[in-house]
Amino acid sequence: MIRPLLVQTMIAGVLFVLTATAYAETVNSNADLANSKKTVAYIYSRPMVDALYRLAIEQDKKFGLQQNCKSQYGVEPYSIVVLQPIDFPDNKQHPIKGIWNFRYQIHRCGESKFYNALFIASGTGETPPTPRAYFPGTSNASPLLIKDTMVAALVRASSQSGLKDCKEIDVFDMRVTEDAHDVTEEGKTHRGVWNETWTFRLCGKMFDVPITFIPDATGGGTSFVIHSAKSTEAAAKP
């Protein structure tokens, strides 16, 4: 397996840090990562990157991507989001608590794709965290917001595609189409509004669902508006 130089360099540093440190860390949010060298080293360690590689292979197979590709896969870490606090005791080889999302880009045969993986701590610290494939792409929405939005987006894609009876439905991609900006309507300004497009594969056909996310000015959450679904020209691979 061939990895980009960035990943190779990270792993070299990680191996040293992991063998040289033996102290406890608690990472409550992304803001704590800058001062949590042990945890960061663990997250970017070879076993974690290898898990990303295996998940990417599974995801490519699921989506029918690059099945005839003979080149090696490159795994490029992109970002980490701490979803639940990570507890890493000094006497454990693995964290005992915590969930984090690892966004990464896979490179193969001249093409690349963003995938996401959720890592869930085992609870004992005796075994590695469990990696689970999450929705692909680069959405800025939190997992909770994605969950709240998903049903409405699926209904829109299904109803407007004419494939209401389709049972083979996958989220193929999520991407930001317009970064956070201010929107003024009827004299009221909404700040931090952003737009995304979610691509669904329904029975071998692709449909884009544009979504507008509107953060509440008082911090009460984020609302969303689902726009009309559009068929894409590129057909999904079986």
Could you say what each language-model-derived stretch is?
Residues M1-M10:
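Bacterial N-terminal signal peptides that target proteins for export
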Residues T9-L18:
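Bacterial N-terminal signal peptides
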Residues A20-A24:
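Sec/Tat signal peptide C-region and signal peptidase I cleavage site
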Residues E25-P238:
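Cysteine-centric segments in proteins
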